[in-house]
Amino acid sequence: MPIAPSSAHKPQLNAVLTHFNDLIVPLWQGPGWNAELALPYEALDADHRPLPPQRYRAMACARQLYVFASLIGEPGKAFAQERAAALFRSLQRHFHDAEHGGWFYSI
């Protein structure tokens, strides 16, 4: 995700991006992913295990779709295109209201 920050904020931005790339993205790829439904879990506990699902939200799926699509072509992120495609299919499969148009907020 190329961003052109002001030099005053660059250290903070770099810290956030490092945290995101080194912790958050791997969690979303591993324990934060429900492979059976091909959907992201809403939350993980302190030990990085999924909390029992109460629901799955379209926005959580769309957020991760955006993130993984943004990582396509980045060095070391060869997984991004496959995950973005899976999330796009899941968004359409689970949340699109084909009968009335639009989208379901959650399932």
Features from the language model and the residues they span:
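Glycan-recognition and catalytic cores of secretory/periplasmic carbohydrate-active enzymes
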Residues: 1-107
